[in-house]
Regions:
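Short coil/turn connectors at secondary-structure junctions
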Residues: 2, 6-8, 37, 60-66, ...
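Active-site gating loops and adjacent loop-to-helix segments of metal-dependent hydrolytic enzymes
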Residues: 2, 8-9, 34-38, 70-88, ...
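Conserved mixed alpha/beta catalytic, RNA-binding, or beta-rich assembly cores of soluble enzyme
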Residues: 14, 46-47, 172-175
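Glycine- and other small-residue-rich loops at beta-strand/loop junctions that grip anionic moieties
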Residues: 20, 42-44, 84-87, 119, ...
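Short secondary-structure boundary/capping elements
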Residues: 20-24, 90-94, 122, 149, ...
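Divalent-metal coordination cores built from histidine and acidic residues
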Residues: 29-115
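Active-site core of metal-dependent hydrolases
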Residues: 114-181
């Protein structure tokens, strides 16, 4: 042990452990576990339509512990298009049922409301559905703020969040960012 450092396992709150052909997919055991992360939280890689497939192919086969912030969109980040391209793909009841069936593996609900994700839809309309989903499932939201274009005040977004909700994508330079200039 004199030439090695012993550390507890790290927890990474925002990763994309998923099949490599999925939008942001990366191999968690190869890229996270090998660097000391023993527990990771997927940010919306799966939604209610593909949760069972994801659980069998990724979670059950990985050495690393993986927990999901289930995407508010039915297919999560499986396909290479904006996650909220179709407003109809946000099925509150289906998502709540999926969460109720796997409450230990699904720790929250993922909603990235950047322009790249919301497509032509108003982020406020998507957030309304996400909040209803979170209330009905009693789960926190992993929230990706909308900060470019700056068409929705950060303070107005934060006012919608509840205790235990988590904000991601906040360490950047610019409006709403926490990074020093």
């Amino acid at each position: 042990l004199s030439q090695r450092t012993l550390l507890p396992g790290f927890i990474d709150l925002h990763t994309h452990p998923a099949p490599s052909h999925w939008k942001y997919g990366m191999e968690a055991d190869r890229f996270l576990l090998s660097r000391g992360t023993t527990t990771t939280m997927s940010q919306g890689d799966a939604g209610s339509n593909n949760w069972d497939k994801y659980k069998k192919a990724i979670i059950q086969k990985s050495k690393i512990d993986i927990y999901m912030a289930l995407s508010a969109a039915n297919n999560g980040e499986e396909y290479d298009h904006p996650v909220f391209e179709s407003f109809e793909d946000i099925d509150i009841n289906q998502a709540v049922e999926t969460i109720k069936n796997d409450p230990k593996l699904i720790w929250g609900i993922s909603a990235n409301l950047s322009e790249a994700c919301t497509y032509i839809h108003k982020p406020q309309n998507i957030m309304s559905k996400v909040l209803e989903m979170a209330e009905k499932s009693s789960k926190p939201i992993l929230y990706g703020m909308r900060w470019e274009p700056f068409d929705w005040e950060i303070k107005d977004q934060l006012a919608l969040l509840r205790p235990n909700d988590v904000v991601t994508y906040c360490f950047h330079v610019g409006p709403g960012g926490l990074a020093p200039k």
